[in-house]
Amino acid sequence: ILRRLKAESAESVLEIGCGWSGFAELAVEEGLKVTGLTLSPAQLAWAQKRVPDADLRLQDYRDTKEQFDHIVSIEMFEAVGERWWPTYFKTIAKSLKPGGRAVVQSITIRDDLFAEYRKGTDFIQQYVFPGGMLPSRSAFRAAAAKQGLTVHGEYAFGEDYARTLAEWRVAFEAKWPEIAALGFDENFRRLWR
């Protein structure tokens, strides 16, 4: 993502949905001025300790007032929900300085499956991104274009992501005794297997 951003040292980067601050940490190490937004107080507390040199905030992306050289959003778009796609892209458009670049990483669904998919609620919409919606590539491009944004490139990493999911499962199973001790039951365990 940093390579695709083509950011230079000391440029400003807004991260919409900074999560546990993995990207922010790398970006700060590269000399970028990072502002990260999250809606999770727990994530914010963790991230602020992990990356004290980043400006991390408990803030909704829609409340962004500043402009940035670049914007990054990593697997947050899926949680936005289709009715909010115009607001999401409008916020990116108004928050980018002229000539700025945004990199949005999103899980997508095939174009030929999108029309049927959007009629119902699947596992991801029910349990992972409640109220969210995976975009198809063409739906993503169209929503961005309506707000004056242009998609200049795409990168698919399905095989890499399959490995990521496999590693998450191994880590989940290894930590299951600790997770269970927090009060989560076998139904929860099966849900994420």
Language model: regions and residue ranges:
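Substrate-binding/catalytic lobe of Class I Rossmann-like enzymes that use SAM or dcSAM, i.e.
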Residues: 108-193
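A short glycine-rich, Lys/Arg-flanked "PGG" loop and its adjoining helix->strand segment in the class I
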Residues: 86-98
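Conserved SAM-binding loop
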Residues: 47-48
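Conserved beta-strand signature within the Rossmann-like core of class I S-adenosyl-L-methionine
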Residues: 99-106
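Conserved SAM-binding strand-loop segment of SAM-dependent methyltransferases
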Residues: 51-61
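Conserved class I S-adenosyl-L-methionine
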Residues: 9-17
